[in-house]
Amino acid sequence: MAEHVVYVGNKPVMNYVLATLTQLNEGADEVVIKARGRAISRAVDVAEIVRNRFMPGVKVKEIKIDTEELESEQGRRSNVSTIEIVLAK
């Protein structure tokens, strides 16, 4: 399952939708959409576009939310929210 992961960043939403659809069409039973920080809303958009517009049979199997603690080069620590959305056929 580790190879069926889409990491969402700052690119346009449709790039990640296409990556997710490609994974599902190549035989993956599940695809994990992962994002951190400000990209979380984009990850939710990706999951909803895949489900509603392209593949209505796909369901949200699981959603995990968490917080990662990052340390900057100056030694300052900051918390960053993360999300994992598991889509399954």
Swiss-Prot record:
Specify the protein name.
DNA/RNA-binding protein Alba 2
Q: Which GO terms describe its molecular function?
A: double-stranded DNA binding; RNA binding
Q: Which organism is it from?
A: Archaeoglobus fulgidus (strain ATCC 49558 / DSM 4304 / JCM 9628 / NBRC 100126 / VC-16)
Tell me the function of this protein: Binds double-stranded DNA tightly but without sequence specificity. Involved in DNA compaction.
Q: Which InterPro entries match?
A: Alba-like_dom_sf (IPR036882), DNA/RNA-bd_Alba (IPR013795), DNA/RNA-bd_Alba-like (IPR002775)
Similarity annotation: Belongs to the histone-like Alba family.
Q: Which UniProt keywords apply?
A: Chromosome, Cytoplasm, DNA condensation, DNA-binding
> Which SUPFAM superfamilies does this chain map to?
AlbA-like
Name the reported effect of residue 54 to R. Answer: Less stable tetramers; decreased ability to bind DNA
Q: For this UniProt entry, which residues form the secretion signal?
A: none
* GO biological process: one example: chromosome condensation
Q: Which NCBIfam families match?
A: DNA-binding protein Alba (TIGR00285), PRK04015.1 (NF003088)
Location in or out of the cell: Cytoplasm; Chromosome
- State the oligomer form and interacting partners: Forms homodimers and homotetramers. Interacts with Alba 1.
Q: Which GO terms describe its cellular component?
A: chromosome; cytoplasm
